[in-house]
Amino acid sequence: MLPMITEFINYGQQTIRAARYIGQGFMITLSHANRLPVTIQYPYEKLITSERFRGRIHFEFDKCIACEVCVRVCPIDLPVVDWKLETDIRKKRLLNYSIDFGICIFCGNCVEYCPTNCLSMTEEYELSTYDRHELNYNQIALGRLPMSVINDYTIRTISNLPQIKNE
């Protein structure tokens, strides 16, 4: 008779513990009910990226000194830097610079360690293509500004500014 009573007490304790766990889970579920949804309707709504978002790399050809620091700090040796030594001025002349975004892990080391700041991360994240070879960007494609910057009305070129007349 005594083992039957202890089994009944254990069963009751397990039932109370299970009900408490179910209640805790239910309270967590209810606490999420008053939050706004995180889901966005992608083609029609765009994500607002954070200030330090690491998207596509922007490259400024004129600033690059072909030092290859970006290649040395890259964990996968990704940037391809082609240069030619100008013997008369004893400096390197950059011929070609390319990055394959199909392989890039967007770690940002190349941007952080570049001595001339010719590399920067943009907020552009839409890099999908049907052919993986289209993800290999040369210096011309890397030099293009992202669409969010091009369409931003607050950024104007000097040619678009109103002319000031000096009279």
Swiss-Prot record:
UniProt cofactor note: Binds 2 [4Fe-4S] clusters per subunit.
GO molecular function: 4 iron, 4 sulfur cluster binding; iron ion binding; NADH dehydrogenase (ubiquinone) activity; quinone binding
Gene Ontology process terms (BP): photosynthesis, light reaction
Record has DNA-binding as a keyword: no
Record's keyword terms, sorted: 4Fe-4S, Chloroplast, Iron, Iron-sulfur, Membrane, Metal-binding, NAD, NADP, Plastid, Plastoquinone, Quinone, Repeat, Thylakoid, Translocase
Membrane topology: Peripheral membrane protein
Sequence positions that bind [4Fe-4S] cluster 2: C74, C104, C107, C110
Reactions that this protein is recorded to catalyse: a plastoquinone + NADH + (n+1) H(+)(in) = a plastoquinol + NAD(+) + n H(+)(out); a plastoquinone + NADPH + (n+1) H(+)(in) = a plastoquinol + NADP(+) + n H(+)(out)
Main location as per UniProt: plastid
Residues annotated to bind [4Fe-4S] cluster 1: C64, C67, C70, C114
GO cellular component, one term: chloroplast thylakoid membrane
Enzyme's top EC category: translocase
Pfam family, one: Fer4
Signal peptide: none
4Fe-4S ferredoxin-type domain residues: 55-84, 95-124
Domain of life: Eukaryota
Cofactor(s) needed: [4Fe-4S] cluster
Subunit structure: NDH is composed of at least 16 different subunits, 5 of which are encoded in the nucleus.
Homology family: Belongs to the complex I 23 kDa subunit family.
Functional description taken from the UniProt entry: NDH shuttles electrons from NAD(P)H:plastoquinone, via FMN and iron-sulfur (Fe-S) centers, to quinones in the photosynthetic chain and possibly in a chloroplast respiratory chain. The immediate electron acceptor for the enzyme in this species is believed to be plastoquinone. Couples the redox reaction to proton translocation, and thus conserves the redox energy in a proton gradient.
Protein name in UniProt: NAD(P)H-quinone oxidoreductase subunit I, chloroplastic
Record organism: Nicotiana tomentosiformis (Tobacco)
Source species taxonomy: Eukaryota, Viridiplantae, Streptophyta, Embryophyta, Tracheophyta
Name of the gene: ndhI
